[in-house]
């Protein structure tokens, strides 16, 4: 891979940003990097990333607080829940709308990945409402990798008191602090722990009407993802639902996310997602339903227990 040739589109994008053409310029970078990543081995792509990050375009896009927070990883991982709030809550920027940073921020928080994140939040909220409407009692829910739990903003059942308990499980204590601070009147119980501890059965929760995971499976290799799915399924009560979300390989922005946000995920196809749960006892499963976002960038697997 010749850096001089492959970096030329980044030169053009930097010039375009200076001319007020952020959308056009960054879209071209997304397409260019996606093509390079698809045609490269993992080793050559990772080596090329150092050239991308040494190009002055990185400094320009890192003026956006969402992109830079992901890349800088103040909590040790990307993206953290505070970064995702730029996408899920449209946090205001302390800059004028005419500032080039505003255009970069709009691109980053309204692109393909951002739309998938909002789809995920809304899909979880709809599932909470659906489960609560079917439950004979106030619903019991377990959220693995809760983040800031922004599905609460969209769930009618939570606001109406049809959820009896929502266990918010997360490895980041700051996320749990934010949940307690921002949703003090909701029936949320926070619990600090790791994915590994769930997989090992060290945090035992049961009799849940809904158990869901958002953003965890993409961070795990296959054996760990299988173990997490199996452990979460054991928490589901008869008639309850395991709800798994996962980014799909159709995310064109993947190379851009890796280059400028250092946001790396394991992308799994439809069949790969089913492969994570194929060892669940078939006699205990009532239904398996797979759906995906309109752009086929995020998959949802819903498993109802007998």
Q: How does the language model describe each region?
A:
Residues 1-39, 43, 47-55, 91, ...:
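Class I (Rossmann-like) S-adenosyl-L-methionine-dependent methyltransferase catalytic domain
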Residues 47-107:
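N-terminal, positively charged/glycine-rich alpha-helical extensions of SAM-dependent methyltransferases
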Residues 144:
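Conserved beta-strand/loop positions that form the S-adenosyl-L-methionine
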Residues 200-211:
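A short acidic, Gly/Pro-enriched loop at the edge of an enzyme's catalytic core
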Residues 213-216:
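A short beta-strand submotif of the Rossmann-like class I SAM-dependent methyltransferase core
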Residues 220-221, 236-238:
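Helix-to-beta-strand junctions that scaffold the AdoMet/dcAdoMet cofactor pocket
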């Amino acid at each position: 891979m010749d850096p001089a040739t492959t970096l030329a589109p980044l030169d053009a994008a930097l010039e375009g940003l200076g001319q007020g053409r952020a959308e056009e310029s960054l879209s071209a970078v997304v397409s260019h990097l996606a093509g390079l990543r698809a045609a490269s081995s993992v080793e050559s792509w990772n080596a090329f990333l150092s050239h991308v990050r040494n190009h002055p375009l990185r400094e320009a896009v890192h003026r956006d607080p969402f992109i830079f927070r992901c890349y800088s990883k103040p909590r040790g991982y990307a993206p953290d829940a505070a970064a995702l709030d730029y996408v899920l809550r449209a946090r205001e920027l302390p800059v004028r709308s005419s500032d080039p940073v505003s255009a970069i921020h709009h691109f980053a928080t309204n692109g393909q990945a951002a739309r998938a994140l909002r789809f995920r939040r809304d899909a979880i909220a709809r599932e909470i409402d659906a489960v609560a409407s079917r439950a004979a009692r106030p619903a019991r829910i377990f959220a693995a990798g809760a983040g800031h739990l922004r599905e609460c903003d969209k769930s009618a059942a939570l606001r109406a008191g049809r959820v009896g308990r929502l266990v918010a499980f997360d490895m980041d204590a700051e996320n749990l602090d934010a949940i307690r601070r921002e949703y003090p009147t909701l029936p949320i119980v926070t619990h600090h722990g790791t994915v590994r501890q769930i997989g090992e059965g060290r945090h035992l929760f049961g009799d849940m009407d809904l158990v869901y995971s958002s953003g965890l499976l993409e961070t795990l290799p296959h054996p760990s993802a299988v173990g997490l799915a199996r452990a979460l399924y054991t928490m589901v009560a008869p008639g309850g639902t395991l709800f798994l979300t996962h980014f799909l390989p159709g995310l064109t922005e993947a190379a851009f996310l890796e280059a400028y946000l250092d946001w790396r995920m394991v992308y799994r196809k439809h069949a790969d997602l089913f492969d994570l749960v194929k060892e669940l006892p078939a006699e205990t499963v009532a239904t398996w339903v797979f759906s995906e976002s309109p752009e086929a960038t995020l998959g949802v697997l819903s498993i109802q227990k007998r």
